[in-house]
Curated annotation (Swiss-Prot):
TM annotation in the entry: 50-70
Gene source species: Rattus norvegicus (Rat)
Disulphide bridges, residue numbers: none
Main location: membrane
Record's compositionally biased regions (Basic and acidic residues): 8-22
Glycosylation sites: N116, N119, N314, N473
SUPFAM superfamilies linked: Quinoprotein alcohol dehydrogenase-like
Record keywords: Glycoprotein, Membrane, Phosphoprotein, Signal-anchor, Transmembrane, Transmembrane helix
Places the protein is found: Membrane
Name of the protein: Protein FAM234A
Length: 552
């Protein structure tokens, strides 16, 4: 039988709920006390939350706007190839590179001599006071080959040095400094071609200039490196210093006391002393910049001398630093372990000299070096020197380890006299791609007129030591050549300047650019040794995949 309480609960189900509600009401004050004890979110906390979400929304909105609404700035689209022609002109063995129009693509500067002013120039030879023909300088866009600026600069040019480095805080523009054959000495703005300064030469018209113009640290405190010009008259070599920003002579001319007859080099010893090095027949002569500066200004507050070098020079009657086994032909500074070393090429041998004590590190004997060596990387981050040994059909390309002189690679590659120099470009694997010029058909070269012989451009990479890639064939007379990284890590190309072989016979002058990667698919694969299992197309694909990087 059902209990009375259960029966009542079944008949009046809400009655118990009312009792529970009353019990809960009785406990309400305690609950409210507990709620009052709980922390209530402050206004500052709410403001922080609102600020956070507002900032997040703004950031997302900005990202959206930058990504989808505002277009990216137009990047100049570099053409794979272009060509610029000048009729009835002659040109010079000179190419300079730099970003003239500041579009992050390298541009090309060159010289040509023309009777008529170009359509790209607003000034003629007569406007600048020259008779026709006169020498023009032109800056050409590396992007598409358009002329950025062009103007007549001299009656004829003997020497030119472009893009003189300036300090960051200097107000002096980078410049091209030109020395004319008939007495002019001037500098023009690298970016606009406008004249920065112009003066007559300070030495006799019978004197010949010893190239190149040497650059010395700032003497007159104007923030620009200054210039040292050496000239030879008779048996005497003299030098003069000029301000890099104004062109005015600093002091007077002074004799070096040597009978040098070749290209001068400025060398820095381990102590930081600067010396002018000159080939003197079968010897190497040296003069301290400090000593020359003291002679021409009467002051000795700039530069320093190296005691050990002064001892070597004082022991010689004619300021000879060392004697060579043959006539000194080329001299160049190369990176050493603790500073600059010297690579000396004579008519008998090639040797690397320690940059401080001039002791040979290695010697390559019985050489007949065709032209000034170049540097590259055969192994990753390890410098190699490229030597073109022999002449004409007997020429060999030698790659030597710069630090030890050991042979890394060699290959016969016949050429004709006057062929363009070799060059190299660093690749992404920290090696170098090397570019050599040679004869397309050495067998028939002896039977052909040199003017009808084709020069071939060959490409070599150390990862494929048994392969040469023939990229192009050129029958025109090549005046200047260089391989250039026009955009960092984007594309490499070669620049070719062709023109008449004689400056007395005007003709067609052409400046051309060709992208290396676009030449690879149509190239000819030359196997130097047996055993390569890759097909020619696979080899071309490997060359096409090469990526290039800047040296610095």
């Amino acid at each position: 039988m059902m209990d009375d309480k259960d029966l009542e609960a079944e008949i009046h189900p809400l009655k118990n709920e009312d009792k529970k509600s009353q019990e809960n009401l009785g406990n309400l004050p305690k609950t409210e006390d507990n709620l009052k004890n709980k922390p209530v979110p402050s206004r500052l906390s709410r403001c922080r939350t609102v600020a956070f979400f507002l900032s997040l929304f703004i950031c997302l909105f900005v990202v959206f706007v930058l990504s989808f609404i505002i277009p990216c700035p137009d990047r100049p689209s570099s053409e794979d190839k272009w060509r610029l022609d000048y009729d009835y002109a002659v040109t010079y063995d000179f190419l300079a590179l730099g970003d003239v129009d500041r579009d992050e693509v390298q541009d090309v500067l060159f010289l040509y001599k023309n009777t008529n002013s170009s359509n790209n120039s607003t000034r003629s030879c007569a406007d600048e006071g020259f008779s026709t023909p006169c020498t023009f300088m032109a800056a050409v866009s590396g992007t598409n080959g358009t002329v950025l600026w062009e103007r007549p600069l001299a009656q004829d040019v003997a020497h030119v040095k472009c893009a003189v480095p300036q300090t960051r805080d200097s107000k002096v523009s980078s410049a091209c400094v030109l020395v004319g054959r008939l007495g002019s000495f001037m500098a023009v703005n690298f970016f606009t071609g406008e004249t920065l300064w112009s003066h007559p030469r300070s030495f006799s018209g019978n004197a010949s200039i010893l190239s190149p113009l040497l650059q010395v640290p700032d003497i007159d405190g104007d923030g620009a490196p200054d210039l040292l010009m050496l000239s030879r008259e008779g048996q005497e070599v003299s030098g003069a210093l000029y301000s890099g920003s104004t062109g005015y002579q600093i002091g007077h001319r002074g004799s070096l006391g040597v009978d040098g007859d070749g290209v001068a080099l400025l060398h820095v010893t381990r102590t930081g002393a600067q010396y002018i090095l000159l080939p003197c027949a079968s010897a190497l002569c040296g003069v301290s910049v400090k000593g020359l500066y003291k002679r021409i200004t009467g002051r000795d507050d700039h530069f320093k001398e190296d005691p050990s070098w002064e001892n070597m020079l004082n022991r010689s009657a004619h300021r000879r630093l060392l004697h060579s086994s043959g006539a000194v032909r080329y001299l160049m500074n190369v990176p050493g372990k603790t500073g600059q070393d010297l690579l000396l090429v004579s008519s008998e041998d090639c040797k690397l000299l320690d940059g401080q004590d001039l002791v040979p590190r290695w010697t390559l004997g019985a050489t007949q070096v065709l032209r000034k060596p170049i540097l590259g990387h055969y192994k990753p981050d390890t410098l190699a020197v490229v030597i073109e040994n022999g002449t004409s059909l007997d020429r060999q390309i030698l790659l030597l380890d710069l630090s030890t002189g050991s042979m890394l690679w060699s290959q016969p590659l016949p050429s004709l006299p006057g062929a363009p120099p070799s060059t190299s470009l660093m690749t992404a694997d920290h090696r170098s791609a090397f570019f050599f010029w040679g004869l397309h058909d050495p067998v028939s070269a002896n039977e052909m007129d040199p003017q009808d012989t084709q020069h071939s451009l060959y490409m070599f990479h150390p990862t494929l030591p048994g392969i040469l890639l023939e990229l192009a064939n050129v029958s025109a007379n090549i005046v200047a050549f260089d391989a250039v990284l026009f955009e960092p890590s984007r594309h490499a190309a070669y620049v070719l300047l062709t023109g008449p072989a004689s400056s007395d016979v005007p003709g067609l002058v052409s400046l051309t650019k060709h992208r290396v990667r676009d030449l690879v698919p149509g190239s000819r694969v030359i196997h130097l040794s047996e055993g390569s299992s890759d097909s020619d197309q696979a080899i071309r694909d490997r060359f096409s995949r090469l990526r290039y990087r800047s040296e610095v």
